[in-house]
Amino acid sequence: MTKTIALLGATGSIGRQTLEVAGELGLRVAALTANTQVDLLEQQARQYMPRLAVLYDENAALALKKRLRGTGIEVMAGEEGLLAAAAMTEADTVVTAVMGSVGLRPTLAAIQKGKRIALANKETLVCAGELVMDAAEKYGAEIVPVDSEHSAVFQCLQGCRDRGEVRRILLTCSGGPFYGKTFDELEHMTAADALRHPNWHMGPKITVDSATLMNKGLEIIEAMRLYRLPVEQVQAVIHRQSIVHSLVEFRDGALLAQLGTPDMKLPIRYALTYPYRTESPDKPLDLLTCGALTFAEPDERAFPCLRLARYAAAVGGTACAILNGANEAAVGLFLRGEIGFNDISRRVERALERVPVQYQPSLADILEADKAARHAAL
């Protein structure tokens, strides 16, 4: 069980909830990192007194350094700071809750130190899954997923002695705020519309990804990497209630599912306490009041991002890094009101058509594909 954490992405939704859980469990916090939020990271640093605080933005880091003068907390900036936080000796678990491909190098740095990785940064496995999983095997690092769906699958597989027994993984999906709409109806949806998720409270980027179903597409790729399965054995299913977090179907026809309230603190707690379970102060799921549970097939005509993700997964190589980089760029444009909702999938498809795919890529190849895809999506 975890005793000390380094938290990458402390000011985001997952980061804030991780600190709540860490406080409940009595864990020590050795490092906190964020992008630009000086005020919140200062508040967190004063409360949890880590040895290291990192802001990716250099000007923000300078401001934080002045504010934390006299506290004994070291302040660093940029990727150098993220790498230092990920590799610090006293942290036995690194929680990677940063958004986007910026989490890739720090995750690899933590893996090379043989640490447990509580992985909430799906882009790491999407872009460089084979590199990451091979490195984890080489250095004896343990990867425990924090995404609710992958945590559910991870839990369902605990009694599985042979992955050959798995017939398929079923990742559940709420359908987002636009479930039931056609592609034409989605043409004029705004960022404000997309940010109204029916069940989960998340950051803006992942909420938009949930609205386009790209989030589920990325999770399909992540599951392929985590569990070493072909794309044909990973499937998305619409489950509006977000009670069943995912399912595993075995060769004998048995279907195991993990159920719980739509609360990210549950998978965060599990990732930090695995292989043990601890008492939670949160209200558990009441099956007698949760009502009917429904399941349906996703509409890939209305939500082409899911189809594009499956395509990239089948192509392999750097195609998934191209998919992810283009999507990050397109979602940023959408959130700033510069493009429409359906333009996100159009920009991603354009990048997949224009950027050459490299097979058996190095880390440098992956990062170059990410950069080229972002440019192609603009």
Write out the residue ranges for each language-model feature.
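Catalytic, metal-anchored helix/loop core of enzyme active sites in primary metabolism
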Residues: M1-L378
